[in-house]
């Protein structure tokens, strides 16, 4: 595995790969790798000649009072995991390399960001779109891989690629979970022991919501009430428990088509998110 630190070096390397006719699968991460990241690498390894991973804790996507400094980092551990999982090129730039002293141009996301995480994290997805535009330009990917745990991010990336006519294929990958259903996340290490047990309520609540919809419930408010009743039994503070169309993230009442049930709960030192996608069959829509 090659480790690269500068924009110039990664751009030159990946351009040469593409000139040689090789396909590149790109896995952008913020590090502190876990099995969820490894599942992205595994998929990228199967699909492409070259796998490039970036590890960059992007300061632009952290708002005031958020956990940029506290975000877990262990680059040596990550380097070993990346090498062992089949990554060919690891790109680990410093913030100064990506942004210089002060950015001249940044991205502004106009849709799909005023709900869910975007509602309480002003500017977050502008930061995501800005850094991904830079990383896509640097790594020349054929395909990019994102976990569906961050489904709103996947929706934003879908818009970014389509709106800017990027010749990149977006590959969403199913959320990787612990045995008890908790979505794997770098932030899970910040949970206290009792919070770790309580955190399983997120997936239970989502499963219950999906069950209601599959059994014919089409009132989003009724589904949200049931989800909240489960989450309220934890010590965490509910940020949101919502249902929208997917990937457009618009209100749909009654519920039809593909919808996302998404939750976010703030525990003492960790904000956890999770979601389930439910595809309502056309014949069920007609019965409404």
From Swiss-Prot:
The keyword Methyltransferase does not apply. ATP binds at residues 30-37, 147-150, 184-187. It comes from the Bacteria. GO terms for molecular function: ATP binding; pantoate-beta-alanine ligase activity. Its EC number is 6.3.2.1. The active site is at 37 (proton donor). GO terms for biological process: pantothenate biosynthetic process. (R)-pantoate binds at residues 61, 153. Catalyzes the condensation of pantoate with beta-alanine in an ATP-dependent reaction via a pantoyl-adenylate intermediate. Belongs to the pantothenate synthetase family. The reaction proceeds by a bi uni uni bi ping pong mechanism. This is Pantothenate synthetase. It comes from Bacillus licheniformis (strain ATCC 14580 / DSM 13 / JCM 2505 / CCUG 7422 / NBRC 12200 / NCIMB 9375 / NCTC 10341 / NRRL NRS-1264 / Gibson 46). The lineage of its organism: Bacteria, Bacillati, Bacillota, Bacilli, Bacillales. The gene is panC.
